[in-house]
UniProtKB/Swiss-Prot annotation:
The lineage of its organism: Bacteria, Bacillati, Bacillota, Bacilli, Bacillales. This is Nucleoside diphosphate kinase. The keyword Membrane does not apply. SUPFAM superfamilies: Nucleoside diphosphate kinase, NDK. NCBIfam families: PRK00668.1 (NF001908). GO terms for cellular component: cytoplasm.
Length: 147
């Protein structure tokens, strides 16, 4: 089973969208194996967005992601990365397909409600950055026996 990292950003948390997003994830069949509400500090934000250091939008990005709590999750399932990315929609909500999280709940690229790993390498890095191994659980969903 593939794992991926997904985070409801401060705008999503502040707008009360955690429950709606978790519901969509679970209805799609992905399993949440770790989750926590947390406040990201600057040090963690810089590690998370290290590939953007030096870019013109970096300080705004750090300021936004540290502006309020986030809900961090590890999801597990077949093709979890691609599935989560399809559910989220394109980074620019105006280009996202109808029915995706970003199309339904976001209006601006810089405030687009949700983040998700874009590759197995970034998923591994982000999971290790936000979760200790003992925070990631292994369990069987009741429905798994019926599938």
């Amino acid at each position: 089973m593939e794992q991926t990292y997904v985070m409801v950003k401060p705008d999503g948390v502040e707008r009360g969208l955690i429950g709606e997003i978790v519901t969509r994830i679970e209805k799609k069949g992905l399993k949440i194996v770790a989750g926590k509400l947390m406040q990201i500090d600057r040090e963690l934000a810089e590690k998370h967005y290290a590939e953007h250091i030096g870019k013109s939008f970096f300080e705004d990005l750090i300021g936004f992601i540290t502006s309020g709590p986030v809900f961090a999750m590890v999801l597990e399932g077949d093709d979890a990365i691609a599935t989560a990315r399809r559910m989220m929609g394109k980074t620019n909500p105006l280009e996202a397909d109808p029915g995706t999280i970003r199309a339904d709940y976001a209006i601006h690229t810089n405030r687009n409600v949700i983040h998700g790993s874009d590759s197995p390498e970034s998923a591994k890095r982000e999971i290790q950055l936000f979760f200790a191994p003992q925070e990631i659980l292994s369990y069987q969903k009741a429905i798994d026996t019926w599938i």
